[in-house]
Amino acid sequence: MMTQMNYTGKVKRVAIIANGKYQSKRVASKLFSVFKDDPDFYLSKKNPDIVISIGGDGMLLSAFHMYEKELDKVRFVGIHTGHLGFYTDYRDFEVDKLIDNLRKDKGEQISYPILKVAITLDDGRVVKARALNEATVKRIEKTMVADVIINHVKFESFRGDGISVSTPTGSTAYNKSLGGAVLHPTIEALQLTEISSLNNRVFRTLGSSIIIPKKDKIELVPKRLGIYTISIDNKTYQLKNVTKVEYFIDDEKIHFVSSPSHTSFWKRVKDAFIGEIDS
């Protein structure tokens, strides 16, 4: 969905976030040198209007989590300095094009849904998080046994390595490698995909990815106490005695700078997984 922020006559506050690779540092240095003397821009990592991520999708995920509490005020734009990145609109040799587009920018944005996760521990504490791609729950040392509940109704009893819940844009990441479907981000939904489920005459699950609409809620209720590995995008945590994990579509969205260089979702999918097709 395309919307617009009001930037009329406003100096744009820009944060530049780069990984440690040589080419990323070169790109960041060029951007710093241009923006520091430009009266239309103000370089600041505090309360930015625009966050420029330099690196790859992992760097964009890190930038998202740096500013996940300011999503209503921030727009992101990615520059890729390696192989093609799914979230990036610019390559490292297109810095001048990015600068020109930002100078012409009128606040237009492309918005994608994100995931909200609430993890309840046995002492009553609730750990909350947001994910741009996916959240996974695994129990490494033993088979994970958990009830999957949709809208307060038990759907199935799961036995296997774990469960992944992804956003539409995250459907092209780990979810796809698990055999899940690719979901267009204008469809505000979550996708639940099993990780190595046990299916036989005794234990059965649906065995297919499930698409959950925005108004619905997924709950995962582990049946055994112990240590669970929970991943939120590119961050992994070891949590003891998890009693419930809840998943929702967040009311907030991530916003990307919309410009002539913004790549459509299906072109991103084609470039990432198919490439050029011989006629």
UniProtKB/Swiss-Prot annotation:
One of its GO terms (molecular function) is NAD binding. Keywords: ATP-binding, Cytoplasm, Kinase, NAD, NADP, Nucleotide-binding, Transferase. SUPFAM superfamilies: NAD kinase/diacylglycerol kinase-like. Its main location: cytoplasm. One of its GO terms (biological process) is NAD metabolic process. It catalyses: NAD(+) + ATP = ADP + NADP(+) + H(+). It is an enzyme of class 2 (transferase). It is found in: Cytoplasm. NAD(+) binds at residues 57-58, 133-134, 159, 161, 172-177. This is NAD kinase. Gene3D superfamilies: Probable inorganic polyphosphate/atp-NAD kinase, domain 1, Probable inorganic polyphosphate/atp-NAD kinase, domain 2. Its cofactor is a divalent metal cation. NCBIfam families: PRK04885.1. It comes from Streptococcus pyogenes serotype M28 (strain MGAS6180). The active site is at residue 57. One of its GO terms (cellular component) is cytoplasm. Coiled coil: none annotated. Its EC number is 2.7.1.23. Belongs to the NAD kinase family. Involved in the regulation of the intracellular balance of NAD and NADP, and is a key enzyme in the biosynthesis of NADP. Catalyzes specifically the phosphorylation on 2'-hydroxyl of the adenosine moiety of NAD to yield NADP. It comes from the Bacteria. InterPro entries: ATP-NAD_kinase_N (IPR017438), ATP-NAD_kinase_PpnK-typ_C (IPR017437), NAD/diacylglycerol_kinase_sf (IPR016064), NADK (IPR002504).
